[in-house]
UniProtKB/Swiss-Prot annotation:
Principal subcellular localisation of the protein: secreted
Protein known as: GPI-anchored hemophore ARB_01545
General function of this protein: GPI-anchored cell wall protein involved in stabilizing the cell wall.
Signal peptide start and end residues: 1-22
UniProt-annotated stretches for the region Disordered: 86-160, 172-248
Segments of skewed composition (Low complexity): 94-139, 172-215
Keywords in alphabetical order: Cell membrane, Cell wall, Disulfide bond, Glycoprotein, GPI-anchor, Heme, Iron, Lipoprotein, Membrane, Metal-binding, Secreted, Signal
UniProt note: domains: The CFEM domain is involved in heme-binding and contains 8 cysteines and is found in proteins from several pathogenic fungi, including both human and plant pathogens. The CFEM domain adopts a novel helical-basket fold that consists of six alpha-helices, and is uniquely stabilized by four disulfide bonds formed by its 8 signature cysteines.
CFEM domain: residues covered: 23-112
Topological category with respect to the lipid bilayer: Lipid-anchor; GPI-anchor
Length: 264
């Protein structure tokens, strides 16, 4: 009995489906038949049209297929006929009907929830770098007031000039300290020596005497000579004068006098 009921239901569903497909153009019929065969892809068990027809992707796929492959056809009519085909197959969402010979029955259709996944790409944060002149010795300045922007009116006689003033921020002076040390040393040595006669009045062979000698010949062929020495005192020489020139002068004078005596 049950087998005959199942066969009857299957035959009735096939006849209804054929009727529904006949009401659609050939292009949209192909889309509907294609979507009715995607139960496994959509996660529905075989011979469970209720799961397939209640799946959102069944309707979306039927709509997209008709739009892309069958331009000009009424997409909403194709979707409506697709849902009608599901109902004729016994896949109306939430209900099923038994064979009319055994009465009515109730059943539930189960659907698998779908989950969508997406990805969001967030741009990595960027970093920038810059440089500004740093205050010396660790000092820093801080803003202490801001002059807001506004007009500036300048009156000169009958002339009135209005200009705009930008906002200005005033900063404190750079605070900090500067310290440093400088050290150095300079050493040197030198000697200076001068030589010269000391300003004394002592008689010496340098300051007062100069030997002189003369030689002469006698008429008899003999030879003789005399050597005299003289000494004299004079004023002490100054640092810019030496005593040797004076002594030499005195010696020359003595020699000339001796020659004069011999000539007599």
């Amino acid at each position: 009995m049950k087998a005959s009921v199942i066969v009857s239901v299957a035959l009735g569903a096939s006849m209804c489906l054929a009727t529904t497909l006949a009401e659609l153009p050939a292009c949209s019929q192909a889309c509907l038949q294609s979507m009715l065969g995607k139960a496994a892809e959509l996660g529905c068990p075989p011979h469970d049209p209720g799961c397939l027809c209640s799946h959102p992707d069944f309707t979306n796929g039927l709509r997209d297929c008709t739009k892309e492959a069958c331009p000009g056809e009424n997409i909403e009519k194709v979707v409506e006929e697709g849902q009608k085909a599901c109902k004729d197959m016994g896949g109306a969402p939430g209900s099923s009907t038994g064979a009319p010979t055994t009465g009515t029955g109730s059943g539930t259709a189960t659907g698998t929830p779908t989950s969508g996944s997406g990805s969001e790409t967030t741009a990595p944060p960027t970093s920038g770098s810059g440089s500004a002149p740093a205050p010396t010795s660790g000092g820093h300045s801080t803003p202490y007031t801001t002059i807001p922007a506004g007009p500036t009116v300048i009156t000169s006689g009958t002339n009135v000039i209005t200009t705009s003033r930008p906002a200005t921020t005033l900063y404190t002076e750079v605070s900090g300290s500067q310290s440093g040390s400088e050290s150095g040393s300079s050493t040197g040595s030198g000697s200076e020596s001068t030589s010269g006669p000391e300003p004394t009045s002592a008689t010496s062979s340098e300051g007062g005497s100069s030997p002189s000698s003369t030689e002469g010949s006698g008429g008899s062929g003999g030879s003789g000579g005399s050597e005299t020495s003289g000494s004299g005192n004079g004023p002490s020489p100054t640092p810019s004068q030496g005593m040797a020139p004076k002594a030499t002068g005195l010696g020359v004078a003595g020699a000339i006098g001796l020659v004069a005596l011999l000539a007599l």
